[in-house]
């Protein structure tokens, strides 16, 4: 299989067919584009969502929390708690766990989440630490109805394309970035984390609006998922997809496509009252821009000046590609080093 998330085709063929026979208590739609699950009991509707990250920097954990909790908030579910599972390399030490827990505690305090369970272990098959977060909440309005969006419904981007991935690249490869960029640029980029949209902020959206968090695969994957989930076609003004200049420059440095870069903390919003929604978002201090509208047909088109093209199926996330290429580069360096040692000993 390709690097990163399995394709929609594989998921439908190998996952969906297997689980359709059960799930009698679940009213959530089991679909590739869905990032949360719902279980109905006699008293309450429980909803949960999971997100995983991998990387050497302890700060990665906060992005998993933002993603998992944000997916609940996008469904108008207030996240209340998280459980955590961490896989370490066998060579890891206790300080790495302490660093992750410190950052986890900070982000959970900031977002009002309880930490209910933490499991950590090391294994010989782990190449870099993997953190999985499961967030849970209770649906406050279990009678929410699926809405059919009419042509002309506006699509708003709240947040910045590829910002999460940009921040994670700084965490993982600051030494590399310092070969090109000044310390002030690096510090300014780190402060961009304040532009990430948090779950509590998403819950402030008006009742009629529908939101969906971008994530793995970037804003283009988010648009595809939105179309799949809401059964809509649309026209998107590609030039309106907001990017931080720091994202542009860092993606250029690593030769990455920012529109395919993981974007947790940014949301796509459907609304029939675009002007009011934009005004309320901006008044609350959230970066937001109108990027397109729903069309009567199912076509998903991207317009960039005079060029119009159809939205492609989601591609692998650029951060996953970066990690893969980095690993291959390190392996090549190791082989060159081994060959040099062998040559010197002959």
Language-model region placement:
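Helix-biased detector of long, well-ordered alpha-helical tracts
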Residues: 1-346
């Amino acid at each position: 299989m390709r690097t990163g998330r399995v394709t929609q085709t594989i998921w439908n063929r190998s996952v969906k067919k297997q689980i359709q026979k059960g799930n009698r208590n679940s009213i959530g739609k089991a679909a590739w584009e869905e990032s949360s699950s719902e279980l109905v009991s006699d008293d309450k509707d429980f909803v949960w969502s999971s997100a995983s990250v991998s990387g050497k920097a302890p700060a990665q954990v906060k992005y998993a929390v933002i993603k998992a909790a944000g997916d609940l908030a996008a469904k108008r579910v207030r996240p209340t708690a998280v459980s955590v599972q961490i896989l370490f390399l066998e060579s890891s030490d206790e300080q790495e766990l302490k660093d992750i827990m410190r950052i986890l505690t900070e982000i959970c305090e900031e977002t009002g989440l309880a930490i209910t369970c933490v499991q950590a272990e090391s294994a010989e098959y782990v190449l870099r630490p993997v953190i999985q977060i499961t967030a849970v909440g209770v649906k406050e309005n279990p009678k929410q109805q699926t809405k059919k969006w009419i042509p002309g419904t506006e699509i708003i981007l709240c947040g910045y394309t590829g910002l999460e991935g940009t921040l994670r690249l700084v965490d993982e490869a600051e030494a590399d970035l310092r070969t090109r960029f000044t310390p002030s640029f690096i510090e300014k980029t780190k402060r961009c984390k304040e532009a990430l949209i948090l779950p509590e902020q998403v819950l402030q959206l008006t009742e009629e609006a529908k939101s969906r968090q971008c994530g793995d695969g970037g804003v283009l994957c988010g648009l595809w998922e939105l179309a799949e989930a809401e059964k809509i076609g649309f026209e998107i003004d590609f030039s309106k997809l907001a990017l931080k200049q720091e994202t542009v420059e860092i993606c250029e440095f690593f030769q990455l496509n920012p529109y395919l870069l993981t974007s947790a903390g940014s949301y796509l919003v459907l609304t029939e009252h675009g002007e009011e929604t934009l005004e309320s978002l901006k008044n609350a201090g959230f970066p937001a821009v109108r990027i397109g509208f729903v069309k009567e047909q199912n076509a998903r088109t991207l317009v960039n000046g005079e060029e119009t093209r159809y939205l492609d199926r989601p591609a692998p996330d650029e951060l996953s590609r970066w990690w893969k290429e980095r690993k291959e580069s390190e392996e090549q360096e190791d082989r060159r080093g081994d060959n040099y040692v062998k040559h010197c000993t002959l």
